[in-house]
Amino acid sequence: QWENVISKNSNVIKWQVINLCAYDWLEKIKDGNYDLFLAKPPGVTQRFKQLYDERLYILCNELGAKVFPTLQEVLIYENKRFLSFWLAANNIPHPVTWVFYNKEEALNFINNHKNYPIIGKINIGASGKGVQFLNSKKEALNYIQRSFSKVGLKSRWYPDFKKGNLIKRMKNFTKNKSYRNQRVSIYKAIYNESQRGFVILQEYIPHNYEWRVVRIGDSFFAHKKLKKGEKASGSLIKEYGKPPFDLLDFVKEITDKHQLYSQSVDIFESDRGYLINEMQCIFGQSDPYQMLIN
């Protein structure tokens, strides 16, 4: 997306693409004289997300580069484990989340846990991918056993056939070789990766919808993501209406404090007030109406 926008302004902007996952990334950065770096962190596999985060850390903290979105925004993007720690450390309301790196600790926790369902999450994956409802102690114990097994937990690697425009997407997949090769490469990468050695569990918040609040600079947009089946994330079913001002103020206060100016925030309404479920610095808008200015 960055390339598409900048290429249309090549007459006024000098730019170059640097692959932060390539072996010579640092040499290319040092050889140039750049005013700004536009980051596009990967969100498909943990292996490349970790590599990207580490190199962006060097770029920002050791070389003093100016980057947008910021390092802070990239670190909490597509990293549910890190996000849970960050939210808790900053006393930001969110569903209670437990991360276990010790199998016995996780099993003991479930043996004493009374409230179900409980949510199991894969560390990386958008649109509700990798989210599993554990409806009983038996299901939760089995989930933990798989988390610490040699196979581990796997996210959905194949296309989501429940999403809309299936025929259009299949035609594009069939006719567009470049797109097909790209998608197959992504599917293989997800298939070959598994999460093992730790487990992420989260309290279930009853809901019929999530709020999606987007901040871009000083502009704010919001709509409801309606629930389809068990989840609102990834349903692509939206409801438009005037969002509560206290919801926008809630997001503004948090993003102002932490200087997060490119954010999509998914929020539950609960008896404890607003709870942040996800925060993403890279996001899309499927409907131009979502950007309507009031």
Question: What positions do the PLM features span?
Answer:
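C-terminal active-site "lid" helix and adjoining low-complexity regulatory extension at the edge
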Residues: 238-242, 257, 269-294
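Protein kinase-like catalytic core scaffold
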Residues: 118, 200, 221-222, 263, ...
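Coil-to-beta-strand transition motifs
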Residues: 92, 208, 260-262, 271-274
